[in-house]
Amino acid sequence: MRMVCISRSNDIAIGLRLAGVQSFFIKDEKEIKDKIRELSKDANVGIINVTEDVYEIAKTELNSISKTQDLPLIVKIPNSK
C-alpha cells in the first residue's frame, strides 16, 4: 500500500516527495475533488494525506470515503505557514 498527498502548497508537495510520498500539487477545486475520487478507488492507496485547505474544499467527499470505506485512511495535515 502506498501513501499519497494532495496539497495546494508546492512546498508541502515537494517536501513529501523528498520523503518518498507521491504528492499532487493541485490548485483547482474541481481537480482536487476528482483526484480524491480517483485515489479513493485505487486499491494500492492506503493513506491519503490532505492539507487543511484541501480538506475544507473536499470535506463532503472525504467524510463520505471515511464512512463507507475501510481504506484509504484520510489524514489531515497542517498547511505550511
Stretches found by the model and what they are:
Residues M1-K27:
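N-terminal first-folded block
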Residues D11-I12, E31, V54-Y55:
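Alpha-helix capping/helix-boundary segments
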Residues G15, D34-K35, I57-A58:
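Phosphate- and divalent-cation-binding pockets in alpha/beta enzyme and binding domains
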Residues F25-E31, P78:
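Short beta->alpha connector loops at strand-helix junctions that form conserved
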Residues V50, V54-K81:
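C-terminal structural segments of small proteins and small subunits
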Residues V21-Q22, S40-K41, N63-K67:
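Short, solvent-exposed amphipathic alpha-helical segments in soluble enzyme
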Residues E31-L39:
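A short, acidic, amphipathic alpha-helical segment used as a generic capping/interface helix at domain edges
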